[in-house]
């Protein structure tokens, strides 16, 4: 076998891990990949760091195009997040008939049509296993096995290790969001840019939905909601009700379209994915027979395994001269699925927390508003004692039956207008696998 040469664009966390795995396993598994020729193109262009990681064993340069047009390179790992610069190198690589392995989700969304067109013309692979869920091989699993099945709930994912870490700290230590965020910022890069982290998570969600349902990648159709307004009280109350707070990102397929939501949801503690805590990721796939598969690796590890998996696939394709097993980005122009446009059309049960003063008829007014909107208050028999304690402190929470979100929005506006209610109402969606 003639070895395959690999060029890495970026050698930070992901790129460095990829280099280490390829170099370490070269002799052990006899993989037909030579140690990668590395290009370091991070914003700081820190070539000294690149030389330190590689130990001076490979060529290092700060010119991305020198790696792209190098005839020896059959594979390119693309790690840097500078979108337009990487798009240019992507075009050049496709023209040079190089297989491209990308960990850059924003790049896949922003330039998907152009990359797909050029890649198909040149007959090269565009692989992006590492772009979702921190190294879980979920793209191959969904594309080859569980995707496009007529299930009401196909994919649910915890695909932001930083968010999951913050929620775990809030639950275990009872800290406020701002305190945990400040503690996490020196250690976790995504914690320093919360708004960017939310966008990255929505990118991952959109990729999963596109693969699962064969829809075009429509990032502007994804609903994104952070956890900054979540209080430690909500996490504690969820535990008392038998739920555990998680930042679920769930593309689902009801009859009218595909729902896309990135939002914090209380989830029953007995579900198979509830052991995913701290910086771990998890993806849960439900099939048409209501069975559940959970993919749950350690998100603290490098994405290298996912990048290397794509490189190995590309190597097999090159030697056997067959078409790629995973179609480029998997969006079908003839797909009948559409993204549902408004979050107000989503159906869910809801948890409400509100602060109220002690006035006669207070609970009756709230119940009447919920009943007017065809909403039903659910009493928690096991939590009656705790509810009594919360009534004395002026805090209530009401788990409700399934309803359309726009009805709940109207009810919340009416509840907040009551004289006995102080401040705004906290609302969380409560999801269960049986729905």
From Swiss-Prot:
A sodium ion is seen in the structure; a metal ion may subtly affect the relative position of the nucleotide-binding region to influence enzyme activity, and could increase the stability of the enzyme. One of its GO terms (biological process) is methionine biosynthetic process. NAD(+) binds at residue 14. Residues 255-274, 377-402 are annotated as: Disordered. GO terms for molecular function: homoserine dehydrogenase activity; metal ion binding; NAD+ binding. Its EC number is 1.1.1.3. It catalyses: L-homoserine + NADP(+) = L-aspartate 4-semialdehyde + NADPH + H(+); L-homoserine + NAD(+) = L-aspartate 4-semialdehyde + NADH + H(+). Belongs to the homoserine dehydrogenase family. Catalyzes the conversion of L-aspartate-beta-semialdehyde (L-Asa) to L-homoserine (L-Hse), the third step in the biosynthesis of threonine and methionine from aspartate. This is Homoserine dehydrogenase. The lineage of its organism: Bacteria, Pseudomonadati, Pseudomonadota, Betaproteobacteria, Nitrosomonadales. The gene is hom.
């Amino acid at each position: 076998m003639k070895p395959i040469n690999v060029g890495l664009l970026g050698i930070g966390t992901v790129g460095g891990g990829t280099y280490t795995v390829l170099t370490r396993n070269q002799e052990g598994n006899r993989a037909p990949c030579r140690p990668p020729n590395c290009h370091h193109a991070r914003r700081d262009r820190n070539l000294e760091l690149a030389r330190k990681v590689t130990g001076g064993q490979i060529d290092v340069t700060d010119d991305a195009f020198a790696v792209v047009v190098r005839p020896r390179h059959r594979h390119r790992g693309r790690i840097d997040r500078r979108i337009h610069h990487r798009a240019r190198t992507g075009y050049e690589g496709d023209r040079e008939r190089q297989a491209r392995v990308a960990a850059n989700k924003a790049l896949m969304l922003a330039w998907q049509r152009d990359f797909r067109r050029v890649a198909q013309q040149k007959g090269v692979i565009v692989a992006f296993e590492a772009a979702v869920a921190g190294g879980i091989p979920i793209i191959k699993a969904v594309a080859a096995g569980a995707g496009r099945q007529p299930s009401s709930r196909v994919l649910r994912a915890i695909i932001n290790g930083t968010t999951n870490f913050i929620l775990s700290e809030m639950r275990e230590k009872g800290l406020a969001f701002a305190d945990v965020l400040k503690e996490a910022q020196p250690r976790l890069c995504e914690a320093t840019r919360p708004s960017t982290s939310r966008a990255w998570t929505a990118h991952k969600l959109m990729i999963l939905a596109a693969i699962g349902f064969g829809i075009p990648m429509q990032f502007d159709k994804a609903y994104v909601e952070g956890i900054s307004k979540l209080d430690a009280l909500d996490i504690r109350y969820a535990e008392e009700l038998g739920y555990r707070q998680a930042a679920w990102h769930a593309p689902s397929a009801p009859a009218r379209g595909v729902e896309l939501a990135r939002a914090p949801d209380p989830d029953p503690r007995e579900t198979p994915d509830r052991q995913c805590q701290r910086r771990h990721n998890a993806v849960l796939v439900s099939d048409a027979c209501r069975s559940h598969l959970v993919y749950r690796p350690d998100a603290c590890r490098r994405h290298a395994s996912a990048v290397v998996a794509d490189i190995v696939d590309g190597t097999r394709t090159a030697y056997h001269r067959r078409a790629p097993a995973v179609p480029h980005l998997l969006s079908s122009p003839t797909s009948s699925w559409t993204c549902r446009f408004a979050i107000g059309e989503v159906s869910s049960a809801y948890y409400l927390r509100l602060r109220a003063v002690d006035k006669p008829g207070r609970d009756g007014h709230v119940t009447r508003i919920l009943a007017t909107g065809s909403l039903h208050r659910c009493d928690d028999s096991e939590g009656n004692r705790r509810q009594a304690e919360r009534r004395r402190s002026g805090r209530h929470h009401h788990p409700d039956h399934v309803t359309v979100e726009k009805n709940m929005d109207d009810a919340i506006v009416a509840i907040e207008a009551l004289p006995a209610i102080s401040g705004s109402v906290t609302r969380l969606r409560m999801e269960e696998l049986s729905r």
